[in-house]
Amino acid sequence: PLWAKATFPDPAGMVAKAHSLGLKAGWYMNNCQCRETRQTNATWVAAVYRQSVAMLADQKWDEVKLDGCSQFHDTSLWANLMEETGRPIAIENCNNEQPPAVGPNPDWADHDGQCPYNWYRTSLDILPSWPSIMNNFGSTVRYTQDLTHPRSKPGCWAYPDMLQVGNLATFEEDRAHFGAW
């Protein structure tokens, strides 16, 4: 993984500080700033997955956000590799670049039918407008409609992208958006 080493010289120390304050720490993996999409060497790609997971476990990160901007968005592989470390690392699936957003498959073969991530985004990027906010909220509905076998449930929650609190026109709009989220 890449990071601004001049700004963050000691990520493990930062994680330890967060833990000492009773907080959890998360890493934003394969973000859209680094488009690792042109690599075709399978050995190199597999090494990136393994080295990234080793870093997350060694530095004791608690959560990782997997964005859909690069070729490293195989959530089942990420989950399997993280499970092998013995350290619980929560996975946020943000594969939003594949509309409609990729939700959990009820037949995950590698995970005994269980969702390989802890929460997943159901919408495209949210904008600071009510139509965008309402569209994103609506994108979660299809994952909760089957009450017998919901695909949004404890351990595998659907969410409608980030909050736009502070970016809306009024305090009341911000509060309504926060409350609905």
Features from the language model and the residues they span:
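Aromatic-lined carbohydrate-binding/catalytic grooves of carbohydrate-active enzymes
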Residues: 1-74
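Active-site-proximal substrate-binding groove within the catalytic cores of carbohydrate-active enzymes
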Residues: 79-96, 100-181
